[in-house]
């Protein structure tokens, strides 16, 4: 099972997109549809962008992994604020 470790740094609400979390990917491969559980709330990645372009996957070794924005549901805002600068492990959904 693929796992990716993402460290969120900033959280923004973007009209027409939802919640955009910028940060860096420390390891693994991150794809839309992957899921994390933070404080018993499941969070699903809706999309990934880097350098203003949608991307289907990013690896921890890619240059885009350092300036990454992941799009998440707005319902995740409260748990993400508490998780800024902490590692979040995303896994492939089953």
Predicted segments with their positions:
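Residue-level signal for inorganic ion chemistry
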Residues: 33
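Beta-strand/loop-dominated core regions that host nucleotide or nucleotide-derived cofactor-binding catalytic loops
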Residues: 2-15, 24-26, 37-94
């Amino acid at each position: 099972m693929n796992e990716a470790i993402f460290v969120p740094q900033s959280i923004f609400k973007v009209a027409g997109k939802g919640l955009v979390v910028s940060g860096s990917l420390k390891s693994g491969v991150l794809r839309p549809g992957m899921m994390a559980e933070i404080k018993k709330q499941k969070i699903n990645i809706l999309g990934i962008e880097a350098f203003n372009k949608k991307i289907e996957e990013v690896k921890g070794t890619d240059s885009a992994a350092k300036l990454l924005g992941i799009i998440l549901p707005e319902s995740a805002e409260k748990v993400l604020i508490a998780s800024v600068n902490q590692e979040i492990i995303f896994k492939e959904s089953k």
